[in-house]
């Protein structure tokens, strides 16, 4: 957040439009594949705005959540102030228990540097399941290393130990100058990243019925703890 304190009044509206649009295409593709319904928790939150905050001004945002038989939790949301540098834009897909394909998380942010996060959230402990690592993470390793080697981008390391523990070996969490070239780079990276995920869904083996309850407990715990420990979780609490 040191970047934000140094540049608190940058208009990031154009970046919001592009990043929200990139995520919208992903969310619409998920909605086209799975039968999901809007969750009551997002009623009245398609667009919201706060009272004036002494530091961040008026915060605004949108919260859109969906659920279905094959998707436990699908969220497309953002919060921030487009005239005061800060944005947190999220697209998250927590799958149901019909298989063990990793969940999907794509985040854009502005601080006001561009922040980018792309992750296949594991469905089990990777330390004790090397076959799962080989199946879902080893094929992504080269792309991850190439992204990390890009001199325009700097690896973003969370101050929170729990959040760092959530990251898989191929999790992209990086920041760069806020410009169209770097947003283009993220968009290009996501084309392959998202298509690979959908290919996994097409090829996935069904998880036996008797293992699904335990998988659901694991998935829910990861989701809840991830949200509660998220760095930006404090922002709406402070403002609202």
Each model region followed by its residue ranges:
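Generic secondary-structure transition motif, activating predominantly at the C-termini of alpha-helices
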Residues: 30-38, 67, 79, 99, ...
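Polar low-complexity intrinsically disordered regions
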Residues: 1-6, 216, 240
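Extended, charge-biased low-complexity segments
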Residues: 70, 74-143
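Alpha-helical structural elements
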Residues: 11, 15, 29, 42-43, ...
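Short Lys/Arg-enriched alpha/beta "domain-start" segment
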Residues: 2-96
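Mixed-charge (acidic/basic) macromolecular-recognition segments
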Residues: 117-231
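Extended amphipathic alpha-helical scaffold segments
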Residues: 233-240
């Amino acid at each position: 957040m040191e970047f934000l304190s140094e540049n608190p009044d940058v208009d990031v509206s154009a970046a919001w439009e592009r990043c929200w649009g990139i995520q919208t295409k992903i969310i619409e593709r998920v909605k086209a594949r799975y039968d999901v319904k809007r969750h009551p928790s997002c009623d009245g939150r398609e667009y919201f705005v706060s009272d004036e905050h002494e530091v961040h001004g008026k915060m605004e945002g949108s919260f859109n959540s969906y659920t279905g038989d094959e998707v436990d939790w699908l969220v497309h949301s953002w919060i921030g102030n487009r005239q005061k540098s800060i944005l947190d834009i999220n697209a998250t897909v927590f799958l149901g228990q019909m298989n063990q394909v990793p969940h999907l998380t794509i985040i854009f942010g502005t601080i006001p540097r561009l922040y980018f996060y792309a992750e296949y959230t594991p469905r089990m402990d990777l330390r004790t399941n090397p076959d799962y690592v080989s199946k879902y993470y080893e094929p992504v390793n080269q792309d991850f290393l190439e992204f990390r080697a890009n001199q325009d981008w700097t690896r973003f390391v969370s101050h929170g130990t729990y959040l760092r523990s959530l990251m898989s070996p191929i999790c992209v969490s990086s920041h760069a100058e806020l410009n169209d070239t770097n947003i283009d780079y993220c968009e290009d990276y996501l084309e392959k990243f998202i298509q690979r995920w959908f290919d996994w869904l097409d090829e996935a083996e069904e998880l036996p019925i008797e293992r699904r309850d335990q998988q659901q407990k694991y998935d829910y715990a990861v989701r809840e703890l991830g949200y509660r420990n998220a760095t930006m979780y404090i922002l709406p609490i402070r403002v609202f």
